[in-house]
Amino acid sequence: GVDPYSASKSSTEIMVRAYRESFFKKTNRIAVSTGRAGNVIGGGDWSPKRLIPDCIKSLRLNKTIFIRNPKFNRPWQLVLEPLKGYLMLALKQYQEPLKYSGAWNFGTKPNSVTDVKTLVNHIINFWGSGKIKIKKNNFYEQQNLQLNIKKAEKYLKWKPTYNIKNSVKMTVEWYFRVLQNKEDPKKVTSDQIDRYIHDS
Protein backbone atom coordinates (compact mmCIF):
# COMPACT_ATOMS: atom_id res chain seq x y z
CA GLY A 1 0.00 0.00 0.00
CA VAL A 2 0.96 3.66 -0.39
CA ASP A 3 -0.37 4.92 2.93
CA PRO A 4 2.05 5.52 5.86
CA TYR A 5 0.84 2.48 7.81
CA SER A 6 1.43 0.09 4.90
CA ALA A 7 4.74 1.76 4.05
CA SER A 8 5.96 1.23 7.62
CA LYS A 9 5.32 -2.51 7.28
CA SER A 10 7.21 -2.63 3.98
CA SER A 11 10.12 -0.71 5.51
CA THR A 12 10.38 -3.23 8.33
CA GLU A 13 10.49 -6.11 5.87
CA ILE A 14 13.25 -4.43 3.86
CA MET A 15 15.38 -3.79 6.95
CA VAL A 16 15.03 -7.32 8.32
CA ARG A 17 15.82 -8.81 4.93
CA ALA A 18 18.95 -6.65 4.64
CA TYR A 19 20.29 -7.85 8.01
CA ARG A 20 19.32 -11.46 7.32
CA GLU A 21 21.07 -11.55 3.95
CA SER A 22 24.12 -9.60 5.16
CA PHE A 23 24.86 -11.16 8.53
CA PHE A 24 22.87 -14.32 9.23
CA LYS A 25 22.23 -16.28 6.03
CA LYS A 26 25.75 -17.62 5.59
CA THR A 27 26.08 -18.88 9.16
CA ASN A 28 23.26 -21.43 8.65
CA ARG A 29 22.72 -21.41 12.42
CA ILE A 30 20.45 -18.50 13.24
CA ALA A 31 17.07 -18.25 11.55
CA VAL A 32 15.78 -14.72 11.03
CA SER A 33 12.20 -14.34 9.86
CA THR A 34 9.27 -11.99 9.91
CA GLY A 35 5.72 -13.16 10.44
CA ARG A 36 2.84 -10.95 9.40
CA ALA A 37 -0.74 -11.49 10.48
CA GLY A 38 -3.94 -10.02 9.16
CA ASN A 39 -6.21 -7.82 11.27
CA VAL A 40 -6.41 -9.97 14.37
CA ILE A 41 -9.48 -10.06 16.59
CA GLY A 42 -10.16 -11.94 19.80
CA GLY A 43 -11.03 -11.61 23.44
CA GLY A 44 -8.83 -9.70 25.86
CA ASP A 45 -8.09 -6.69 23.68
CA TRP A 46 -8.80 -3.58 25.76
CA SER A 47 -6.85 -1.07 23.65
CA PRO A 48 -8.52 2.31 23.05
CA LYS A 49 -9.53 3.42 19.56
CA ARG A 50 -9.65 -0.12 18.19
CA LEU A 51 -12.72 -1.44 16.43
CA ILE A 52 -13.56 -4.52 18.49
CA PRO A 53 -13.01 -3.04 21.98
CA ASP A 54 -14.94 0.09 20.97
CA CYS A 55 -17.82 -2.04 19.69
CA ILE A 56 -17.96 -4.09 22.89
CA LYS A 57 -17.85 -0.97 25.04
CA SER A 58 -20.73 0.58 23.10
CA LEU A 59 -22.79 -2.60 23.25
CA ARG A 60 -22.36 -2.93 27.01
CA LEU A 61 -23.49 0.66 27.50
CA ASN A 62 -26.32 0.26 24.97
CA LYS A 63 -24.83 3.03 22.84
CA THR A 64 -24.60 3.42 19.06
CA ILE A 65 -21.46 2.01 17.43
CA PHE A 66 -19.70 4.63 15.29
CA ILE A 67 -17.59 3.28 12.42
CA ARG A 68 -15.35 4.85 9.79
CA ASN A 69 -14.93 3.53 6.27
CA PRO A 70 -17.73 0.93 6.31
CA LYS A 71 -16.74 -0.46 2.90
CA PHE A 72 -13.04 -0.88 3.66
CA ASN A 73 -11.99 -4.52 3.40
CA ARG A 74 -9.65 -6.16 5.90
CA PRO A 75 -8.34 -9.71 6.44
CA TRP A 76 -9.96 -10.14 9.88
CA GLN A 77 -8.86 -13.29 11.66
CA LEU A 78 -9.03 -14.83 15.13
CA VAL A 79 -5.77 -14.15 16.96
CA LEU A 80 -5.19 -17.89 17.49
CA GLU A 81 -4.78 -18.39 13.72
CA PRO A 82 -1.48 -16.52 13.26
CA LEU A 83 -0.24 -17.69 16.67
CA LYS A 84 -0.49 -21.25 15.42
CA GLY A 85 1.46 -20.21 12.33
CA TYR A 86 4.19 -18.55 14.40
CA LEU A 87 4.65 -21.72 16.46
CA MET A 88 4.80 -23.90 13.36
CA LEU A 89 7.37 -21.55 11.82
CA ALA A 90 9.48 -21.52 15.00
CA LEU A 91 9.62 -25.32 15.03
CA LYS A 92 10.62 -25.51 11.36
CA GLN A 93 13.26 -22.81 11.84
CA TYR A 94 14.74 -24.72 14.76
CA GLN A 95 14.96 -27.85 12.62
CA GLU A 96 16.22 -26.20 9.41
CA PRO A 97 17.28 -22.58 10.04
CA LEU A 98 18.43 -21.65 6.54
CA LYS A 99 15.51 -23.23 4.71
CA TYR A 100 12.80 -21.49 6.72
CA SER A 101 14.35 -18.05 7.23
CA GLY A 102 12.42 -15.36 5.40
CA ALA A 103 9.17 -13.45 5.28
CA TRP A 104 5.93 -15.25 6.08
CA ASN A 105 2.28 -14.22 5.93
CA PHE A 106 -0.40 -15.73 8.14
CA GLY A 107 -3.61 -14.14 6.96
CA THR A 108 -6.99 -15.18 5.64
CA LYS A 109 -8.05 -16.86 2.44
CA PRO A 110 -8.84 -14.35 -0.35
CA ASN A 111 -12.58 -15.00 -0.15
CA SER A 112 -12.61 -14.32 3.60
CA VAL A 113 -11.74 -10.62 3.38
CA THR A 114 -14.64 -8.69 4.92
CA ASP A 115 -15.62 -5.03 5.05
CA VAL A 116 -15.92 -3.10 8.30
CA LYS A 117 -19.70 -2.77 8.25
CA THR A 118 -20.22 -6.50 7.72
CA LEU A 119 -17.85 -7.28 10.57
CA VAL A 120 -19.71 -4.96 12.95
CA ASN A 121 -23.06 -6.41 11.89
CA HIS A 122 -21.72 -9.87 12.80
CA ILE A 123 -20.66 -8.51 16.21
CA ILE A 124 -24.13 -7.06 16.82
CA ASN A 125 -25.78 -10.29 15.70
CA PHE A 126 -23.78 -12.45 18.10
CA TRP A 127 -24.16 -9.97 20.97
CA GLY A 128 -27.90 -9.82 20.44
CA SER A 129 -28.47 -6.08 20.00
CA GLY A 130 -26.83 -2.89 18.80
CA LYS A 131 -26.95 0.01 16.32
CA ILE A 132 -24.45 1.39 13.79
CA LYS A 133 -23.82 4.94 12.63
CA ILE A 134 -21.25 6.00 10.02
CA LYS A 135 -18.71 8.58 11.18
CA LYS A 136 -16.72 10.78 8.80
CA ASN A 137 -13.07 9.75 8.49
CA ASN A 138 -10.39 12.38 7.92
CA PHE A 139 -7.44 9.98 7.82
CA TYR A 140 -6.18 8.33 4.65
CA GLU A 141 -6.14 4.56 4.76
CA GLN A 142 -5.81 1.86 2.13
CA GLN A 143 -9.26 0.62 1.13
CA ASN A 144 -8.33 -3.02 0.54
CA LEU A 145 -5.78 -5.02 2.50
CA GLN A 146 -4.90 -8.67 1.94
CA LEU A 147 -1.98 -11.01 2.65
CA ASN A 148 -0.79 -13.73 0.30
CA ILE A 149 -0.59 -16.90 2.42
CA LYS A 150 0.40 -19.39 -0.30
CA LYS A 151 3.96 -19.74 1.01
CA ALA A 152 2.79 -20.72 4.51
CA GLU A 153 0.22 -23.10 3.06
CA LYS A 154 2.78 -24.82 0.85
CA TYR A 155 5.86 -25.05 3.06
CA LEU A 156 4.44 -25.04 6.60
CA LYS A 157 1.16 -26.80 5.81
CA TRP A 158 -0.55 -24.00 7.72
CA LYS A 159 -3.99 -22.75 6.77
CA PRO A 160 -6.77 -20.73 8.42
CA THR A 161 -9.30 -22.76 10.38
CA TYR A 162 -12.16 -20.30 10.90
CA ASN A 163 -14.14 -18.11 8.55
CA ILE A 164 -15.15 -14.59 9.51
CA LYS A 165 -18.39 -15.60 11.25
CA ASN A 166 -16.68 -18.18 13.45
CA SER A 167 -13.88 -15.74 14.27
CA VAL A 168 -16.35 -13.05 15.33
CA LYS A 169 -18.44 -15.57 17.26
CA MET A 170 -15.41 -16.65 19.31
CA THR A 171 -14.46 -13.03 19.93
CA VAL A 172 -17.90 -11.89 21.06
CA GLU A 173 -18.31 -15.03 23.15
CA TRP A 174 -15.10 -14.24 25.06
CA TYR A 175 -16.23 -10.74 25.97
CA PHE A 176 -19.77 -11.83 26.79
CA ARG A 177 -18.63 -14.62 29.11
CA VAL A 178 -16.07 -12.42 30.86
CA LEU A 179 -18.00 -9.14 31.05
CA GLN A 180 -21.63 -10.24 31.23
CA ASN A 181 -21.35 -13.66 32.87
CA LYS A 182 -18.37 -12.67 35.07
CA GLU A 183 -16.42 -15.81 34.16
CA ASP A 184 -12.67 -16.13 34.75
CA PRO A 185 -10.80 -14.72 31.70
CA LYS A 186 -8.11 -17.39 32.00
CA LYS A 187 -10.72 -20.16 31.98
CA VAL A 188 -12.55 -18.67 28.99
CA THR A 189 -9.27 -18.29 27.09
CA SER A 190 -8.26 -21.86 27.88
CA ASP A 191 -11.65 -23.13 26.71
CA GLN A 192 -11.28 -21.30 23.40
CA ILE A 193 -7.73 -22.54 22.85
CA ASP A 194 -8.89 -26.12 23.43
CA ARG A 195 -11.76 -25.64 20.98
CA TYR A 196 -9.47 -24.12 18.37
CA ILE A 197 -6.98 -26.99 18.67
CA HIS A 198 -9.83 -29.47 18.29
CA ASP A 199 -11.25 -27.68 15.25
CA SER A 200 -7.89 -27.29 13.51
Predicted regions and their residues:
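Flexible, glycine-rich beta-alpha linker
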Residues: 1-4, 25-51, 73, 105
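Active-site Tyr-X1-5-Lys
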Residues: 2-33, 56-61
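Conserved donor sugar-nucleotide recognition element shared by glycan-biosynthetic enzymes
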Residues: 4, 12, 48, 116, ...
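A generic local structural motif
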Residues: 19, 52-53, 131-133
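C-terminal substrate-binding subdomain of Rossmann-fold SDR/epimerase-dehydratase oxidoreductases
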Residues: 39, 59-200
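Glycine-rich, phosphate-binding/catalytic loops in enzymes
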Residues: 50-53, 122-124
